[in-house]
Structure formats: C-alpha cells, structure tokens
Amino acid sequence: MKNMKKWALAAALAIAATPAMAGSALQEILSEGVLKVGTTGDWNPMTMKDPATNSYKGYDIDVMTELAKDLGVEVEFVATDWKTLVSGVTSGKYHMTGSASISPKRAKAAGYSISYFSLATVPLTLTKNADRFREWTDLDKADVTVAATLGTTHESQVKEFFPNAKHKIVEAPARDFQEVLSMRADASITSNVEAKKLVQKYPQLMIVPVSKPKAPTPIAMLLPQADQVWINYVNTWISLKKERGFFDKIGAKWNLL
C-alpha cells in the first residue's frame, strides 16, 4: 500500500511538472493540497450525508478518500444535487464527482473516467400493490403515476419506459421514493443498488418483480471534459486499483457484490 501511494504521488508530481500540464486540475490539487469532490449525499449506499454532523459515508466516500490519500492530499466533499451535478464540474466548483451513471446527455458537457461499477433500473412500489404491479407493462397505464428525481438519468427513463403513465418529477432534497411512501405516486424508478437498500429501510416498499431490470448502465466519475491530463491520471488510478482488488473490497463492504 505504501508503494502504491508513493507511485501515485510521484506520477502525479511528474505529470503536473510538465509545462503543458500547468492548467490541469491535477496541478491545482497538488498545489493546494485538496481534492474537491461533488457528492449528493442522498444515494444509499454510494453517498449518505449525516445532517447532524455534515459528514458523509458510503462507497463513493471510501473511493474518493482513497484517491486523495494516494495523491497525498486532503479530500473535501462539496455538497451538490442531481440537477447541478454536471454544472459543478464544468464551473470548477469541484474537481470531480463521485459515481454517476454514464449518459450521452452528461457527456456533452463533462468528461468521464473509465467505469468501475455497473447498475440497472428497477421500479419500486408499496407492498400493498403486489398484485397490481408485477411487470413493466403494468406500470405503463394512464391511471398510474410514476415518480423520478430531477437531474437523474431516471428523469428521462420514466418518460421513455412509461409513455402512457403520468410522470411526477421531484426536485432534491425531495426524492422519488418518498412520493410512493406518501402515496402521491404509485411507483418510482431507481437503481437496483439503491432499491435494495430502500426496501430494507422501508418495509412497506417492494421492488416490482419484473422479469428483467432495464437500462444496464456503467458507472464512472464526472471530470472536466477538456482536462485530459486529469482524466488520464484518474483512469490510470482506477485501472491499478481494479487490478489490486480495491474496488472489490469496497464493494463487499457496502454489499454491492
């Protein structure tokens, strides 16, 4: 582990010392000694914020803390929400984000790291609706309201998957599943990762037993689109950490494997 840290820091310093690389976020991170990471704090088990302490925990938090350690800097988690996740990167509010699903819309404005995890979309409903909703088609009806959260990939998916249903788009800090719990929506869609945690926390919720999840999607970190130096460094770090089992270890810790 010590050798890994020494390698990462040495590589970062060597790259950042190159005159052509002076404008990179990597140079700024090393000069200021701080890696700024945008995170929403509302995606269990990836990123969860404790309002009492303003501290974060989760899969993403562990990953970003490790990246900062290998860079030899401190990590600062910057609060953001889904609708401003990309703009926080493009405006320089933070150097990168935690996990975000890869989408062409986001890629028009921001860059991505290579992927290190995948997820898919599933619907949630109340357990009392078990007989009513069994498949995707059961939700695509005019008398059904399906919720999603503004700024997430699920916002567009809910319209794509359920063209005949009513759509309820909520804005953070409100969340789509809360609309189901309060019975303002019949169902919501979210990642299979979050759905698993939500049904554990709220026994009145259930995952609709669809034959197959939709939209399998790779997960990656959002980065400044034009900063190839920083993107290259992060990609190198991810590749090395994957080979050495780091992502498997963190995935197991948060029950993602």
How would you describe each model-predicted region?
Residues 24, 153-167, 207-209, 238-257:
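Ligand-binding clefts/hinges and TM-proximal coupling segments of bilobed small-molecule sensing domains
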Residues 26, 56-60, 107-119, 207-211, ...:
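A structural signal for short loop-to-beta-strand junctions that line the ligand-binding cleft
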Residues 127-144:
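Flexible hinge/capping segments at coil-to-helix
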Residues 84, 100-109, 156-160, 181-182, ...:
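A ligand-binding cleft/hinge motif common to bilobed small-molecule-binding domains
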Residues 61, 76-87, 168-182, 217:
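Short helix-initiation/N-cap motifs at beta->coil->alpha
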